[in-house]
């Protein structure tokens, strides 16, 4: 495992995030109270306009997140034993994001992350994440979420050509700590991976 590759990928992802389109940077910051954005209801518009607005608001939020990948589990029902034995399931890496909770307590984030993939090659990913959150009334500090991420990744075997990667998201959160996961669908001996990471908000 080459830690220099991970560091370089994280730096490049961070540079991309910091130099995203000026439309994101021009949106004024919104007020913050106890970790939640004080926002007016979302403006009317088509799906694309709402997506751009949500990305912009997350980008301008003062709240930050650290991402630590912890596991890539390959579905044993869709892989040969030989393949499983050859794959890496410890995706060492790190990521960074900016997030907000909207007026409905739903989570929005823009993020960049880099980790070691199944073949021990560096894989970067960056994108926008959204989750509808449920807050149990009698369990203070807990949140449960389900949603999606619209992301772009790049892999060694595809010569690091950027690839779109929309995926589902679910999470369990307690205060600032979250366990978040996605499932990457695929075919036999390809894809079908449960990817899990820890998210720490600061």
From Swiss-Prot:
S-S bridge residues: none
Example GO molecular function: O-palmitoyltransferase activity
Residues marked Role in the phospholipid gating (site): 188
Name this protein carries in UniProt: Lipid A acyltransferase PagP
Protein's GO biological process: lipid A biosynthetic process
Keyword Acyltransferase among record annotations: yes
Stated family: Belongs to the lipid A palmitoyltransferase family.
Compartment(s) of residence: Cell outer membrane
Oligomeric form and interacting partners: Homodimer.
Active site (catalytic residues): 74, 117-118
UniProt site (Role in lipopolysaccharide recognition): 83
Family matches, as NCBIfam families: PRK11045.1
Matches recorded under InterPro entries: LipidA_acyl_PagP, OMP/PagP_b-brl
Lineage: Bacteria, Pseudomonadati, Pseudomonadota, Gammaproteobacteria, Enterobacterales
Catalytic activity: a lipid A + a 1,2-diacyl-sn-glycero-3-phosphocholine = a hepta-acyl lipid A + a 2-acyl-sn-glycero-3-phosphocholine; a lipid IVA + a 1,2-diacyl-sn-glycero-3-phosphocholine = a lipid IVB + a 2-acyl-sn-glycero-3-phosphocholine; a lipid IIA + a 1,2-diacyl-sn-glycero-3-phosphocholine = a lipid IIB + a 2-acyl-sn-glycero-3-phosphocholine
Key words of the record: Acyltransferase, Cell outer membrane, Membrane, Signal, Transferase
Signal peptide span: 1-25
Function: Transfers a fatty acid residue from the sn-1 position of a phospholipid to the N-linked hydroxyfatty acid chain on the proximal unit of lipid A or its precursors.
